[in-house]
Each structure stands twice: as C-alpha cells, then as structure tokens.
C-alpha cells in the first residue's frame, strides 16, 4: 500500500515562472492603490491605538473591568453593525466620500475622548471609532480592488496587509498597553 502512495521518483523542480503582474512599487504609484493602503492603515492604526489604550485610561479614571468591557462591546458593535449598510453607502455616495466620513468620525471620536472622562465619553468615542474604522476599512478595500489586476491580487493584498499590520504594531507600542 505504501508503495502505491509514494511515487518511485520525484521530479526535480523546474525553473519557476516569473510572477505575473506588476511589482508592488508600480502598484504604489497608482493614486487609488496608495489611498486605499493609507486609508486601511489609518483606519486600523487609529482604531488600534485608541482601543488598546482605553481600558488603561478607564482604569486610571477609576472605572472597573465591567465598565471597560461595556465600552469595548459598544466599540465592536460600531465596528461591525455598519457592515449591513456600508456597501450601500459606498454605492450611493461613492468610495472616497465614505472613507472621508470614516476620517471625520475618527476625528469626532478624538474630540469626544478629549472632552471628558465619564463613561459616556468613553462609550461614545469608541462607538464612533468603530464606525469610522468600518467606513475607512471597507472603503479602502473597495478602492483597492479597483487598482490592481486579478493576477496581482495576492501581491497587492500582501502589500496592504503588511502596511496595515506594521502600522498596528507601531500603534500597539505607542498605546502604552
């Protein structure tokens, strides 16, 4: 039985075909791709920075674990509940306006977070942060797929993911968490 499963000879690998499509440097020279990559990184970076720091800030302000958990629950609702209609907003308003709305919601989040230290401030700020992340990331993803060819999908997604998660690593360190 084992002889039937293992080939008698294994063929030597041939020369690998060159990867299809343009290099990442060529993709980055396209404004749509660059904006998509920056939008995704901005959305994730701001979200990660503030989300990671909020439980620590709440603890310093005298709030317990239950309060921090409630705030993070509202943040997660803000991140994912808009997913039911963000695509419709993009179709109706366009990709860039939805991304801009995400940036404005992130700025509103920062304004609310800086305006007070009550549970309502933390909750409203992180809820808006979640919605802003959704609009930025969904918009960025929608924009990105217009900027590369099908054969470049893996390379393009890899470049975007690398930039996004490198940004997240930096904001994790910057958050103090």
Where are these regions (language model features)?
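Short amphipathic helix-loop junctions that connect adjacent transmembrane helices
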Residues: 52-69
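Intracellular juxtamembrane helix-capping segments at the cytosolic ends
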Residues: 135-148
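A late C-terminal transmembrane helix in Major Facilitator Superfamily
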Residues: 152-177
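Pair of pore-lining "gating" transmembrane helices in MFS-fold secondary transporters
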Residues: 29-47, 127
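Helix-to-loop junctions at the C-terminal end of transmembrane segments
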Residues: 82-95
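Structural signature of the two symmetry-related core transmembrane helices
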Residues: 97-111
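Juxtamembrane intracellular "pre-TM" segments in multi-pass secondary transporters
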Residues: 4-36
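Paired small-residue
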Residues: 109, 120-128
